[in-house]
Amino acid sequence: MADDPAMASSNPISDDSLANAYTQIFQILEKHNIPATFALVGLFAGAYEQYVDSRGDLLESEPHRNWLQVPERSFAAGLHDGWFYPELVDQIKSRGNHEIASHSFTHLPLHNEGVTEESFFTEMKFINQWKQINSIELSTFIYPRNQIKFENGLSDFNFVGYRQCDIQNSAYTNRFRILQDECNIGRKSDAHSLSTKPVAIPPGTFLNWRHGPRRVIPKWVTLKRWSNVLDHAVASGGVAHLWLHPHNLITARGQVELFGDAIARVAKTQKSGLIETVPQAEYCKEIAQQAQPRNHE
């Protein structure tokens, strides 16, 4: 949403609504004892003052300067509400069982016009600074808008995996095809990743955002679709990887309940001993271990 012109004058997301959305996510995950990966945009998971400190260097990059036009207009108008969440890192760390991953530093889509490998390195430089400030390790990466590029360079910055992209979550997919996929109650789980460096984590299943045209999709269809993914993972030994955007809980009616019901289905399957729930970094570690040659006596 960082490039939505409306954000410069009327941000639909406030500090309070953002904090409430994350509180609800934490409560649902804790209720069912489910670990998760939280992929954060470093710039906005910090304070406005930290943005001011990095602003000069960022705006020297033309792709970043173009990308940050909307936030710049918002901040120039004195509108900071809903943009920054500096408490989030500590809130995640305090839970003890969740992973913090990187969702870039500025959310710059790497397929934007003018984006080069130097732009990618600029992102990585600021990500490194951000993780040092917050005393965290970052092991996995989720590309902004799922636009994958320069993935071979991630290992140079100690990333062991990144989330792959499929038709469902591609930025270029026709909206009608997306709606078709959201209504596909026969959706299957993903096959396991190969042991590559970095690991291409299965793209997973997006939890329908009940907003705009998507809100016509009944809740039962979304839950049936997700249940089928879980059942197929159990039957085939595949991967059931659910993901969403936290701001979806703010901008869509009934999204909190939908997320809670989807996680309850995960918990039920886990309690039956049929699946194991792990964050992305642990999944990549398991894939790497499985690929190691075994000693035979």
Regions found by a protein language model. Name each.
Residues 199-215, 244-248:
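Active-site clefts of carbohydrate-active enzymes
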Residues 1-199, 220-242, 249-297:
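Catalytic alpha-helical scaffold of carbohydrate-active enzymes acting on polysaccharides/glycoconjugates
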